[in-house]
From Swiss-Prot:
Compartment(s): Cytoplasm, Cytosol; Golgi apparatus membrane
Family per record: Belongs to the COG5 family.
Residues bearing PTM Phosphoserine: 166
GO cellular component: cytosol; Golgi apparatus; Golgi membrane; Golgi transport complex; nucleoplasm
GO BP, sorted A to Z: glycosylation; Golgi organization; inter-Golgi cisterna vesicle-mediated transport; protein transport; retrograde transport, vesicle recycling within Golgi
Subunit structure: Component of the conserved oligomeric Golgi complex which is composed of eight different subunits and is required for normal Golgi morphology and localization.
Domain of life according to the entry: Eukaryota
Topology relative to the membrane: Peripheral membrane protein
Protein name: Conserved oligomeric Golgi complex subunit 5
UniProt organism field: Mus musculus
Length: 829
């Protein structure tokens, strides 16, 4: 019991002591004096140095001693509280030492076994390494011996092939290609047995290359596909096909650049004139004033030679490309053209043509910038330059077609190994344009600056005669001679431009601008004052001037139309361009004559309206004497029209144009005459006879206004059809086949009002309008429906009037008018 109690008391004290110590430790940790010792980067020397510099060293030492004492107590308490765990850890350490000793023993045994294995493996390994090196050297020696044997054999075979000449050249190239392969990746220098052979092979390769180059040049020059194919096969066997073809094309490009420079060299062009007088230092080569013609003659001769050179070079390059396209290697069956373009390189003809066009553009630009004489020659005689280009293009197309014929399957079967006949057509750049590249446009792009300058000068040449014949302040239109001068200038410009369709179109646009300028100048001469449209007295000065302007416009229109018709190579677009401009001339003629036409039409209408001032209500004459053949207004109308045609329109030289405009006046006059004739109320039998005579005379009255009265169409037929209706009954009038077809229903119903009693008023009477105002209303309402509705209103008003007076019946003509109205309304639906 005592022992148990003591144990419990010790444990209790230990627990309470631990709590006290924990609190003490916590106090130490929170104390600034001890907190520095917890830092990971605590340095004893630094701490000591700081403590020495402080004044109270004794206090710090005492503080540290106190802290050490407290920590010792804490450690003691920890050991007492965990003494069983600590004893267990100590026992485990002893066991671990035993395990480690056992592992050390086993590691020693393993090391001994490894040493024994090493002694058994090292010796065989060294032997294997030695044998492997020996085998590798043997293989290298065998490979070298095989190469030497093959080189000796091929060298001997090559000697025989070279003795065979051009017939064996492709085989010689194949042998050389194999010899090159044997020499790759190995150093054969210093081997005496093949030293002479290697020298021979180098000389043979050079000889074969030279022979192949000569064969290629000769074959391309004579366009012999067999020779070209043989040479290409040689270079293919040598492995230099692509490099050789590129070199050949580059050579053609360089030669053409030299030709362009020589053709445009001013010193060469002026050499004859400069031979007598040597230019000093810094003096430019320029043509003397008297030698400009010789300079230009030499220039165009050089240009023709340049075009010949370009054509020949293009033909040779195209021939080369076509052989490349058709030729296949007999062993690999690879088409040669595929070898050229396999790295994305374009076709050689495209490459060459692009280089040619760029060279032309750059050299032409630099040459004309440095020489004003060259620039003036190319700009002033641009059509000649363009003709050379067009001829070159035609020759290239023809040459392309001829080259295609040369490569027919029956002609060179040795070149057409497993290759479709049409495959090379896709390569024909001069006959089949690509969607993304136009070779003809690329060629002519070098001419753009000269074309623009030529067109500008051409426009000036076209404008100059017009500006001369229309001086500032001038009031008279051009004379016939002046118009002839303008026409000759237009003809000359179009004839010179006929060398090219695009140039013709561009010059046609200039001609159109010229015509428009003439129209603007002529319009400024037109008189727009009141006296320009008078039809009372003789021609005024303004009217005379307008007649002269219209006549000059007509002459120009006729002349230019003949010029266009005489151009055999005119395109539809170019012709349409000029004809559109001529339409402005025609429109201006119409505008110039329109005021006079309007005055004539107004005067005719005013005369026709006066028919209502005459009395048509009389009965037929019983004396047997013939009545007046026609009314007074008709005589006045005939006299007026005859006078107008004689005094005004006779002076116009464009009769067809005048009749085209006066025929409309004649048609209008007939329509007004019939309209007003249908409004006459009352109309007696004698009035009908006189009105019938007026109808007959109306044909004669409008005769001067047209070529033939029958050409007036519907108006003339209506005039002829209406006259018999004057004497027919209302029923026959309504049943006439002319009603609705030739004569509008509204006119017939309007005419039937004349046969009705006064109570049935005409529409204008009901509205209390004058005849002139009613006629104006009809002009403002051309719709037949509007006119019929107006007539229906008059009939309905009549019905209301009858009913309002309690009438028992309607006028006999009323049902006929209603029937016609219903028929007319039905026809409109």
């Amino acid at each position: 019991m005592e022992g148990g109690d003591s144990t419990i008391s010790v444990a209790g004290r230990g627990a309470s002591g631990s709590a006290v110590v924990a609190a003490t430790v916590q106090a130490i940790l929170q104390d600034d004096c001890y907190s520095e010792f917890l830092n990971e980067d605590f340095d004893v020397k630094t701490y000591t140095s700081q403590s020495i510099h402080q004044a109270v060293i004794a206090e710090q030492l005492a503080k540290l001693a106190q802290g050490i004492s407290q920590l010792d107590k804490e450690l003691h308490l920890q050991v007492v509280a965990r003494h069983e765990d600590l004893l267990a850890q100590a026992t485990g350490i002893e066991s671990l030492e035993g395990v480690l000793q056992m592992m050390q023993t086993r590691i020693g045994a393993l090391q001994g076994a490894v040493d024994r294995m090493k002694s058994k493996i090292v010796e065989p390994y060294n032997k294997i390494v030695a044998r492997t090196a020996q085998l590798a050297r043997l293989q290298v020696a065998c490979d070298l011996l095989r190469r030497i044997i093959r080189i000796l054999y091929l060298s001997k075979r090559l000697q025989g092939q070279l003795q065979g000449g051009s017939r064996e050249i492709t085989k010689a190239a194949q042998s050389l290609n194999e010899l090159d392969y044997l020499s790759q990746g190995i150093d054969l220098s210093g081997i005496e047995v093949i030293e002479n052979d290697l020298l021979f092979i180098a000389r043979a390769r050079l000889e074969v290359e030279n022979q192949a180059k000569r064969l290629l040049e000769q074959g391309v020059e004579t366009q012999n596909p067999t020779q070209v194919g043989t040479a290409l096969q040689v270079f293919h066997n040598l492995g230099t096909l692509k490099e050789t073809v590129t070199s050949v094309v580059d050579g053609y490009c360089a030669a053409l650049e030299d030709s362009i420079n020589n053709a445009l060299d001013v010193k060469v062009l002026t050499q004859p004139s400069q031979s007598a007088v040597r230019g000093g230092p810094g003096r430019a080569a320029m043509p003397t004033p008297g030698s400009t013609a010789g300079f230009r003659a030499s220039l165009w001769t050089n240009m023709e030679k340049l075009m010949d050179h370009i054509c020949a070079a293009c033909g040779q390059v195209q021939h080369l490309q076509k052989v490349l396209t058709k030729k296949r290697d007999p062993v690999s069956h690879i088409c040669f053209i595929e070898e050229i373009i396999k790295d994305g390189q374009p076709e050689i003809l495209y490459m060459f043509w692009n280089a040619v066009t760029l060279a032309l553009s750059s050299h032409f630009h630099s040459a004309t910038n440095s020489s004003m004489f060259l620039k003036q020659a190319f700009e002033g005689e641009y059509p000649k330059l363009l003709r050379l280009y067009n001829d070159l293009w035609k020759r290239l197309q023809q040459s392309s077609q001829n080259t295609q014929g040369t490569f027919s399957p029956s002609g060179t079967p040795d070149l057409c190994v497993d290759l479709p006949h049409m495959e090379d057509d896709t390569q024909d750049m001069f006959r089949l344009k690509r969607p993304d590249y136009d070779p003809e446009k690329a060629l002519k792009d070098s001419l753009q600056p000269y074309e623009a300058a030529y067109l500008s000068k051409s426009l000036s040449r076209l404008f100059d005669p017009i500006n001369l014949v229309f001086p500032p302040g001038g009031r008279n239109p051009p004379s016939s001679d002046e118009l002839d001068g303008i026409t000759k200038t237009i003809t000359s410009e179009l004839n010179v431009a006929a060398v090219d369709a695009n140039l013709t179109l561009a010059v046609s646009k200039n001609v159109a601008k010229t015509i428009q300028l003439y129209a603007v100048k002529s319009e400024q001469l037109l008189s727009t004052q009141g006296d320009a449209s008078q039809v009372i007295g003789p021609l005024t000065e303004g009217q005379k001037r307008n007649v002269g302007v219209v006549n000059s416009l007509f002459k120009l229109h006729q002349s230019v139309t003949k010029v266009v018709a005489s151009q055999s190579s005119f395109s539809a677009t170019a012709e349409q361009t000029i004809m559109s401009a001529l339409k402005t001339i025609h429109d201006l003629m119409g505008n110039a004559i329109q005021p006079l036409l309007t005055s004539v039409a107004d005067a005719i209408e005013a005369i026709i309206i006066t028919m209502h001032q005459e009395d048509f209500s009389g009965a037929s004459s019983s004396s047997g004497k013939p009545d007046v053949p026609c009314s007074l207004y008709m005589k006045e109308l005939q006299g007026f029209i005859a006078r107008v045609m004689n005094d005004y329109f006779k002076h116009f030289e464009c009769l067809d144009f005048v009749f085209d405009n006066t025929e409309a006046i004649a048609q209008r006059a007939i329509e007004l005459f019939i309209r007003n004739a249908s409004l006459i109320r009352p109309l007696g039998e004698g009035g009908k006879l006189r009105l019938a005579a007026d109808f007959a005379q109306m044909e004669l009255a409008v005769g001067p206004l047209c070529r033939r009265v029958s050409d007036l169409g519907k108006s003339y037929r209506m005039l002829r059809s209406f006259r018999p209706l004057l004497f027919q009954t209302s029923e026959h009038v309504a049943d006439s086949p002319a009603v609705g077809d030739i004569i509008p229903f509204s006119i017939i119903i309007q005419f039937l009002f004349t046969r009705a009693p006064a109570e049935l008023k005409s529409p204008f009477q009901r509205a209390e309008w004058s005849h002139a105002r009613f006629s104006q209303w009809l002009d403002d309402h051309p719709s037949e429906k509007d006119r019929l509705l107006l007539l229906r209103g008059a009939l309905e008003a009549y019905v209301q009037s009858v009913r309002s007076r309690d009438g028992k019946e309607f006028a006999p003509v009323y049902p006929i008018m209603v029937q016609l109205l219903q028929k007319a309304m039905s026809a409109l639906q």
